[in-house]
Amino acid sequence: CFPASKFLDALNANDQLFNIYPLLVYPCKIFNRGGLLKVGGKDTHQLGDGSVIQMNMNLGIYGIPPELENDVYPLFPMVGRVRQLEQWLRNNAGFQHTYCDSFQTRNEFHHMFDHSLYNKMRTKYECKGKFPTVYDKTRPEVDVFKWLKEEEKKNHGIEDTILLG
């Protein structure tokens, strides 16, 4: 999910990373209520009742990349590509829904979301040690950096860093 003004850039990122079509595209109205989502920038609007919203877009990328179907890679570098998309989202004031596959480190996840209120509430209700954090609930189940090395090894060192604008 990303600011609506970044829609064409997001389509280009999908082209470069996955080239999967059709895409599920839908607008999201994000309210600035002090939660985990960061709101701000030129896509922010004030409504008549005084509430602040940000118009975002979301892309659902579902399917098999053509490179995988055409055997371009022995092992499609999915972890590396998702990490590049996550970096693009962080760089463009976007976020990844927590129901998606995520391969972010704890620090990367914290950079993507505003944890101010969340941490305040966890402290107030003494959650530390009793309940897992959002990251702990949604973190990668694989060792991301070990998997990235495996992707590179299986692909015979094929460089797969796509520079997204």
Could you tell me what each predicted segment is?
Residues 52, 69, 77-165:
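Activity-critical C-terminal alpha-helical subdomain
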Residues 1-112:
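Substrate-recognition/cap regions that form aromatic- and gly/pro-loop-enriched pockets
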